[in-house]
Amino acid sequence: FVTNGTSTSNKMVWHHTVAPGDVVVVDRNCHKSILHSIIMTGAIPVFLKPTRNHWGIIGPIPRSEFDIDSIKAKIRANPLLKDVDAETVKPRIMTLTQSTYDGVLYNTETIKSELDGYVENLHFDEAWLPHAAFHPFYGTFHAMGRKRPRNKHSVTYAT
């Protein structure tokens, strides 16, 4: 257990898994502790871009953003990664805000199965979703749960 809160938990996950120059995949609507972690570890981010409505309110990240080919395209387009081969590099971590400040939830099992083995560590920032593990309504909408299969290759973190 961490008594300092989720910001510290997020930084602990990142400092444990990420090294300078690592490619990381991050929710563009992430918490500032993730931005701090990017800076402190020296990681190079590619961002998953959420939708916005005509009032500018942030919505969900489209499913297509989680496609491996889409992530590789983001790596190729990032000027900080011009010397990185998008076909061979494996992102060190993917961090997703789950749920968002507006209550958007993602099906974590879908994301885990899509990225398992491509991204080494799957990190779900669940600071706004601690109750999900205690109610069946949320099913696969939280990162870890009883009697749910583990990833074959990637490590999953929930903070």
Regions found by a protein language model. Give the residues of each.
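Glycine-rich active-site/cofactor-binding loop and its immediate structural neighborhood
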Residues: 1
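Conserved PLP-enzyme active-site core in the AAT-like
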Residues: 4-159
